[in-house]
Structures are given as structure tokens and as C-alpha cells.
């Protein structure tokens, strides 16, 4: 394997000059630069990433801590982040935590040893243990995505789940629905609470009662939508519409409704949340709340790149607002 000394010898220059050409740390005459680059090409020389990182104080790598990469919502965001990192010449270290504080600690320790240039954090919930762990890495440029907490040491991208819950519920009300159920996430989790509070505000503004028997909690999985919807369907009185707090729970709810011989939206309307790629292919195509996954990912990684290059600047909060996507799963009464 060729070394930097081999390149210097072939190009007729010093190893210091070769280093300056590779790292672009000092002006080198064009002719000399071409000689070095040609020698690198001829010898198929690949500079040591570790050695380069020590000299220029960068590893061209980003760490990303996520709850999981399996759900469609997270997967779409991760894809946009990875794509932009690739275009910018950065490697992405993706770490799944399942919200386990021990895993978070181990992943953070590993990323610190890798000397990543910055960190993206996107977890479904932030326990106090998790927050304490993140606080110990305050010197590392960090952007917290989606529903994370804000502190003076991090930048934050906010997704406005409260607004999304309000928009979804108001759309049902504007279409004549008064008897509205909600299939939420766990109401001890931030994102579920915010979407529920948006639902609650819209119902209160319209002077509509919230039936406690129609408030269901799941874990944002299709099985939860299915099981929660079945619990609603065995009741004497049925809602005319259901707000499912993510699209995959809406898929489960639609399946349960169909198994009972009922139709969406003829018998029960369904609105989802997230606008995952598959939602337009549901039967019927799902009316939902659009939260741009690609925009969230792009905003986050661009903010992190900015933080890496401008470490002394004041930290920022960037808000992304959800939008209604109307398809065919809600009926006008």
C-alpha cells in the first residue's frame, strides 16, 4: 500500500507539500498541485482518514441517535439525512436506541471515540436519564429533531404536533362530524400529548363533548390502531369519525372497520397523521396531516453543518408547520 512518502517521492516534493494539497491547508502552486494529484492517482494512494482528522480537526462524519429506523416515519427522515450527508461528503453513523438509556450512553461513548463532527438526536421520548446523558456532550455540535426538548446547548427543530392535532380535528368538525374518537399514542409521551391537546382544543372551540370511552391509547403501531378500533366498535354508540394520531394506526383502524362489515368513509371517517409514503395507497387513500420528513431531515442536517462551522453562534429553534392533505377517507355529513 502506497504511503505519503511514496507520493512525495514520485511528485518530487516534500511530504508536507503533499499534506497541504490533500487537506487544502495552504496555497500550493498549480503545477506542483497537479504533480501531487497525478502521483496520488498513479499510486492509488488513499490518505488515512484518522490521520487527516487529527490534522484538520474533522472526521467528516455525523452521528445520529434515533429511537428506531424501522417505522416508516423515522425511515423517511433518516433517508433524507443520509442522502444529504452523502452529497456533502460526510459519513453517517446511525444508532438505534429503543429509548434505552444504557444504549444511548454506549452509542454516545462510541460516537465520541469516533470523533464525529456533530450529532443529530431524534428520539420518540426523552427521559431525564437521556437528557442528562446528552448534557454531558455539550461541547459537541448537536441538533435535536422533532419533539425533543430545548436547552441552551442544542439547536432544535420543532414539528408543532399540537397544531397538527388541532388541524386534523377541525377538518373533521368542519365536515359536520360531532362524534369524534381519537386513537392516540401513550398519553405520557410528549408527541402523543401534544396531538391530543390539539384535538382537545378543536373540540372545545366547537363546544363538542369528548366521549371518554372513545379516547384510546396505543404505541403508534398498526396493531394498536386495529385493537383500539375494535374496542370502539363493540360499544353501543359509534363515532362518525376517528382521528388516528399516526398513519400506521389509521391503517389498523381501517382494517378493523372493514372486518365489521363497515366502510370508510361511508360509515366511519378516518384521518391520520404523518403522511407517510404509503398513505396515499391505503384503501381508501388516507386523508392525513403532512409533516414533511424530507424537509425535517434537510433542515436538521443543514442546521448541524452550520453549527459545526459556526460553533460560537447563538443556538436556534426552527419550526416546521404541519399541513392538511385531503384524500378520500373523510365523508362530509
Swiss-Prot record:
Binding site for hypoxanthine: 73, 189, 191, 220, 274
GO BP terms in the entry: negative regulation of DNA-templated transcription; purine nucleotide biosynthetic process
PROSITE patterns: HTH_LACI_1, HTH_LACI_2
Sample GO molecular function, one term: transcription cis-regulatory region binding
Annotated region of DNA binding: 4-23, 48-56
Pathway: Purine metabolism; purine nucleotide biosynthesis [regulation]
SMART domains: HTH_LACI
Keyword vocabulary terms for this entry: DNA-binding, Purine biosynthesis, Repressor, Transcription, Transcription regulation
Stretches assigned to the HTH lacI-type domain: 2-56
InterPro entries: HTH_LacI (IPR000843), LacI/GalR-like_sensor (IPR046335), Lambda_DNA-bd_dom_sf (IPR010982), Peripla_BP_I (IPR028082), Tscrpt_reg_HTH_PurR (IPR023588)
Quaternary structure, from the entry: Homodimer.
PANTHER family: HTH-TYPE TRANSCRIPTIONAL REPRESSOR PURR-RELATED, LACI-RELATED TRANSCRIPTIONAL REPRESSOR
NCBIfam families reported in the protein's UniProt record: PRK10703.1
Free-text function comment from the UniProt entry: Is the main repressor of the genes involved in the de novo synthesis of purine nucleotides, regulating purB, purC, purEK, purF, purHD, purL, purMN and guaBA expression. PurR is allosterically activated to bind its cognate DNA by binding the purine corepressors, hypoxanthine or guanine, thereby effecting transcription repression.
Domain notes: Consists of two structural and functional domains: an N-terminal DNA-binding domain, approximately the first 60 residues, and a larger C-terminal domain, approximately 280 residues, which imparts the function of corepressor binding and oligomerization.
Listed name of the protein: HTH-type transcriptional repressor PurR
Annotated organism of origin: Histophilus somni (strain 129Pt) (Haemophilus somnus)
Amino acid at each position: 500500500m502506497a504511503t505519503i512518502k511514496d507520493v512525495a517521492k514520485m511528485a518530487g516534493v516534500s511530504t508536507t507539500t503533499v499534506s497541504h494539497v490533500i487537506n487544502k491547508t495552504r496555497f500550493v502552486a498549480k503545477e506542483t498541485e497537479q504533480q501531487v494529484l497525478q502521483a496520488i492517482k498513479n499510486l492509488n494512494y488513499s490518505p488515512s482518514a484518522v490521520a487527516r482528522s487529527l490534522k484538520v480537526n474533522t472526521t467528516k462524519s455525523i452521528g445520529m441517535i434515533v429511537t428506531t429506523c424501522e417505522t416508516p416515519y423515522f425511515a423517511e427522515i433518516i433517508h433524507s439525512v443520509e442522502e444529504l450527508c452523502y452529497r456533502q461528503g460526510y459519513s453517517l453513523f446511525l444508532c438505534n436506541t429503543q429509548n434505552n438509556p444504557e444504549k444511548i450512553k454506549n452509542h454516545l461513548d462510541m460516537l465520541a471515540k469516533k470523533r464525529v463532527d456533530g450529532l443529530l438526536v431524534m428520539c420518540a421520548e426523552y427521559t431525564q436519564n437521556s437528557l442528562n446523558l446528552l448534557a454531558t456532550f455539550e461541547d459537541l455540535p448537536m441538533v435535536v429533531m422533532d419533539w425533543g426538548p430545548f436547552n441552551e446547548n442544542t439547536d432544535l427543530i420543532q414539528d408543532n404536533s399540537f397544531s397538527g392535532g388541532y388541524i386534523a380535528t377541525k377538518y373533521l368538525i368542519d365536515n359536520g362530524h360531532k362524534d369524534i374518537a381519537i386513537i392516540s399514542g401513550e398519553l405520557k409521551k410528549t408527541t402523543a400529548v401534544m396531538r391530543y391537546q390539539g384535538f382537545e382544543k378543536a373540540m372545545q372551540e366547537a363546544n363538542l363533548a369528548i366521549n371518554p370511552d372513545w379516547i384510546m391509547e396505543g404505541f403508534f403501531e398498526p396493531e394498536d390502531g386495529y385493537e383500539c378500533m375494535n374496542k370502539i366498535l363493540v360499544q353501543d354508540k359509534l363515532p362518525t369519525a376517528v382521528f388516528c394520531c399516526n398513519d400506521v394506526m389509521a391503517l389498523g383502524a381501517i382494517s378493523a372497520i372493514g372486518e365489521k362489515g363497515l366502510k370508510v368513509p361511508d360509515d366511519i371517517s378516518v384521518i391520520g397523521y404523518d403522511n407517510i409514503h404509503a398513505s396515499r395507497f391505503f384503501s381508501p387513500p388516507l386523508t392525513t396531516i403532512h409533516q414533511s420528513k424530507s424537509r425535517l431531515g434537510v433542515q436538521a442536517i443543514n442546521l448541524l453543518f452550520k453549527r459545526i462551522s459556526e460553533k460560537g453562534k447563538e443556538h436556534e429553534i426552527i419550526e416546521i408547520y404541519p399541513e392538511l392533505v385531503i384524500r378520500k377517507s373523510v365523508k362530509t355529513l
